Amino acid sequence: MSNLKNTLRNNRWACWLALACLVVPMFASYFFDDMFSSLSELFKNPQTLELGWNMADYGFYSSGYSFLCIWGGLIVCGALLDKFGVRLVGSIFVGMMVFGAALVTFAISAGFEPSVSLTVAYVGCMLFGLGSEIAGVSVTRSIAKWFKGRNMALAMGLQLAIARFGTATAILVAPMIVRQKALGEIYTLSETNRPALIGLAVLAVGAILWAVFVAMDKKFDKQAGTTDKVETAEEDKFRFSDIWKVLSNPRFLMIAVLCVTFYCCVIRFKKFGVSILLPLFGVDLDIATLLLAMIPFFTILFTPLFGALVDKVGKATLWMIVGSALVLASHLIITFAPQGVPAYAYISIAMLGVGYSLVPSAMWPSVPKIIPEKNLGTAYSLVYWIQNMGMWAVPIYVGHIFAREITETGNHAQEISAALHAEYVFILLGVVAIAVALMLFFSSRRNPQLKLDQPAS
């Protein structure tokens, strides 16, 4: 009996230590991904950057995160996780994440020609992106294993909150270490690569802690007589026909389209948020940075509350409409509110943050209600696949808008025009999101047997 009590499975402190080892790589991943979000203003004037990138280059670089995910990386690597286990495959992709980040850091530090540095950084971002996504899946699966039967929702909520705190930290810290200069002054490579160096250092710490977790997890399985591989019954094994079954479900397609349009309205907006808020509302860089950092802080605060609300009262499709409407209204305010009035910036970002917390709380729990359990893995993979298509395309397009519109350094009229044209993209996406949310609402009304709008039992 004493041996049973001393196993890692039954040691709550060991479980929380394992969680501590798991959250740092995710914090670092989110930090590195958003390290340039509050510095996007720099890319408006490539002639003042030793790096030489313009906004189109920045948008292209940002899209690299999703490239390998689009081309089957998520689905294939998810199958590898099931077959070979979290410790082996997770370690490979944590390593890929760190290597990709190191390649990006090298590319923006080595003094290459802009086209060369962009190409190398794009390859690095592709590797970093796929590594981060699969590392995230590995972390989620590991938390589910270690916290089975005890505080699993709390552990997963803490992991997500700390990861999103990585985004907020990057947004707040980057302008502090790359200080704003007078118009026309040059930003050297040794200045613009500082966020990447810090992000890479945190990723390295995260990789070390992942290795600690792997050792703990191996001992966990040895004590419990289990394996980190997934044993799948013959009838539940993946078949390509499952993809068609999922894609032929109209309500699944609605959720997938809502997912890609809604998330692009928020996540891809963050990549250019400072460059949009500065000219439209006349705020300084510190205020614009603070506004952008409000978005992840809102999700940390409100997502668990809205999740509990959906569980308690149901009405998931209605909450999706409300959240989508808030995000669309936010972009309408940013675009059409009187310019130079900072109060509208605070209102719009607050609405964006609340909407960003509300829709996922209602959307993700709806998927198991419309897809059979044995196809859930395929369904979630397909949602992420479709989402990454938008995540790849939107920053490229928005980056080209800024590069096309801004041809003179410090031309305020051009900066306003670019910000407005970029916002039109996000408004269009928001209109599609709310239209699809309405379609899902009426589909739920016509199909009450799906219980989409019923509270959790």
Predicted feature locations:
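Cytoplasmic helix-loop-helix junction between adjacent transmembrane helices
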Residues: 124-162
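C-terminal transmembrane helical hairpin of 12-TM major facilitator-type secondary transporters
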Residues: 316-363
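Central cavity-lining transmembrane alpha-helices of secondary-active solute carriers
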Residues: 63-79, 293-306
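C-terminal ends and interior cores of transmembrane alpha-helices
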Residues: 95-114, 325-339
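Extracytoplasmic gate region of multi-pass secondary transporters
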Residues: 36-41, 249-299, 303, 394-395
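Glycine-rich segments within core transmembrane alpha-helices of 12-TM secondary carriers
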Residues: 153-179, 384-395
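Juxtamembrane intracellular "pre-TM" segments in multi-pass secondary transporters
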Residues: 2-11, 220-255, 457
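Cytoplasmic membrane-interface "Motif A"-like loop-to-helix N-cap segments
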Residues: 82-94, 311-324
